[in-house]
Amino acid sequence: MYVGRFVVVSPEVGAYRVSSRSFPNRQAVQRDGTVTVEPTPDAPETDNPYISYNGVRVTERGAVVGNGSHVDPIAEKLELGYPARDAIAEPLLSLDFEKDDYDTPRVAGIVGVDAADPTTNADGPGAVIGTVRRDALLVEEVTEPTLVATYEENSPTAFDLAATDASDVAREVYDHEYEHAVCSAGVAGSAGEFDVAVYNGE
């Protein structure tokens, strides 16, 4: 099944995977706690605004994963002290779904939300997942690994994720049976102490 790009979010582990039929010549590059999805050196030139973006941003209050330019404002709002729910909801609402031929949803999550955040009822780290589609804006707390994708699985749904460290998470979601994997990123930890890894199918 082809579900497009997707995030998996839980209190201490998260992932983002690029799956693409149209633009497979992309890679995930890690720089100082940020993972950027960008064209490979041999990729054809394109003016598509949805090809390159930060897919992971680590902050002191949680690690943000997502499928587009909304990752940056979510991370910035977290750093400003917004509750995790609001930090996701406001950028998703303002940026809305992608204005492409498919009305592609935006998906996002925050891993390792501080237990003091009013968004979470967790005793330890919490997690929040969200999506904005043409017909809905959904943001909710999650306590177990949960997936939301751009197509087919476009509402938060339970996901069987066994890995617990960042590199294994990145590899596990890349190798998942969903079709047309391009690259992936994994994050593990809690606020202030995150490990980040990428996998490009080498």
Curated annotation (Swiss-Prot):
Where do the segments described as Disordered lie? 29-52
Q: Which SUPFAM superfamilies match?
A: Archaeal IMP cyclohydrolase PurO
One example of a Gene Ontology biological process annotation: 'de novo' IMP biosynthetic process
Catalytic activities: IMP + H2O = 5-formamido-1-(5-phospho-D-ribosyl)imidazole-4-carboxamide
What is the uppermost EC class here?
A: hydrolase
Q: Supply the EC number(s).
A: 3.5.4.10
UniProt keywords, alphabetically: Hydrolase, Purine biosynthesis
The GO terms describing molecular function are: IMP cyclohydrolase activity
* Pathway where this protein functions: Purine metabolism; IMP biosynthesis via de novo pathway; IMP from 5-formamido-1-(5-phospho-D-ribosyl)imidazole-4-carboxamide: step 1/1
Query: Which InterPro entries does its entry note?
Result: IMP_cyclohydrolase, IMP_cyclohydrolase-like, IMP_cyclohydrolase-like_sf
Classification via NCBIfam families? PRK04151.1 (NF003167), purO_arch (TIGR01922)
Return the similarity comment: Belongs to the archaeal IMP cyclohydrolase family.
What HAMAP family does its record include? IMP_cyclohydrol (MF_00705)
Role summary: Catalyzes the cyclization of 5-formylamidoimidazole-4-carboxamide ribonucleotide to IMP.
Record's protein name: IMP cyclohydrolase
This protein's species is Haloarcula marismortui (strain ATCC 43049 / DSM 3752 / JCM 8966 / VKM B-1809)
Q: What is the lineage of its organism?
A: Archaea, Methanobacteriati, Methanobacteriota, Stenosarchaea group, Halobacteria
What is this protein's gene name?
purO
